[in-house]
């Protein structure tokens, strides 16, 4: 994605943030009150499947009590299949006691959750939410909805159900153990609806002691960015860094990396490029976003002109390593070549600029055409879902470069969760198929089967449509980059022409070589050593490459007006925090320049 989009790059993070592993937030809780017993939902539900005889016992039971009591008995025995039959007798009964029906609805939702029939459970909890506070289990349902958010993607509609509740309703004493989680989830819902004031208030209500505190602060910062309010965004992200610094929990690290990346993007958007490079450099090499942070850092260093060109080219060289084949965004890899060509052009190294353009033209247009064919051959959303599954598993039989590019845009966390949910629904269908035949013959089993099937069809359609849009967006990015490359090619030809005319008019090529200047100064401290790049990448050298760049323009070079440079996103100025040089700048490593030297870690 082009750095010309500035702040928009950050918004992608904001939307996908909830997909960061949140196992840290999955703790055991006291169950919602349901008339006795403790059966709180947890991150890992253990389902004990009933035997045929216990199901038959439910089917043959008559008299000796009410179905609701029978259901409670089976539930307490972990005989959830039999419990669903009894609760269904109450919910489906016409003209029965309304209070008993409402109780059975809630208990049916809990039971289906225990059976891991999450979509069916949600449909019963939705009945309760729609009835509002008049339903006796309205508040208790919130806890189970919170648990469902860990099992289902946002698109399943769980957040919308939580969004039906008022903030004041979260103060109910029954919700004490999950209140912070619900503040976070309700804030997240308001964020998706662009209700930024309400979402910030909710995020700020999450206790610093809560496992959801860090996520809430990240979303708070994202909300301020959406409002183009940089200073409080910076404060929120720095609070995440403070918590991470004081925590020994390794599960905090992904959030720390997101905070560093977000700070870098904010500072880039406010044209504080030195600060931007500082925070880009702090993203851990173990982070999923490290390759993309290297690319974005290249743009920030590019904006520093001569003081940043060496590192920008070094980062781009790093991204050419085979380690990043399936991690760098294909549009970023392609755009990196345009950055490389532009830097060489600005320094009158026209031959090398042309080489970078040639490399782009050798691969990108053909990959774009291959992706267009994939779109044309799979126009139905269900069809595209099927090809996307094959692409994600590396079994599409597409040309390798085409599959690699498509796979890169089909593995983002937001989309991946939808594919995972389809697999989860397939598991639910498989569990249904393996269930006791006596239970499968009941009306409740048929309703559950239909519910799962409908939800699967809807999710396949949604995932297929989203996957298609990802590929369409990539094709559009390639088209825009191709247009930029054509402009750069024209400027290179103009630059070569002017240089030749100047040589003829004023001096010989020999005199021009005398005027060449090398602006790159690579510093080596006691912990690093100078080492030339000889064509082989080493894992511990990635991210440290520097390029010894010469300027042949006879002056300082710079950024001519002919080629458009990226426009950072708008936003209020963020405060300086004292950094004057990019972090990691003292630890350079190899370069690809044939005349260059480099430093590398021991």
List each language-model region with its residue ranges.
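Extracytoplasmic/secretory-pathway proteins
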Residues: 27-64, 86-88, 116-120, 137, ...
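Short solvent-exposed coil/turn linkers within tandem alpha-helical repeat scaffolds
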Residues: 28, 58-59, 92-101, 128-140, ...
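TPR-repeat structural position
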Residues: 80, 118, 155, 196, ...
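Alpha-helical segment of the N-proximal tetratricopeptide repeat
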Residues: 62-89, 181-194, 269
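"A position-specific structural signal for the A-helix of alpha-solenoid helical repeats
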Residues: 69, 107, 144, 178-181, ...
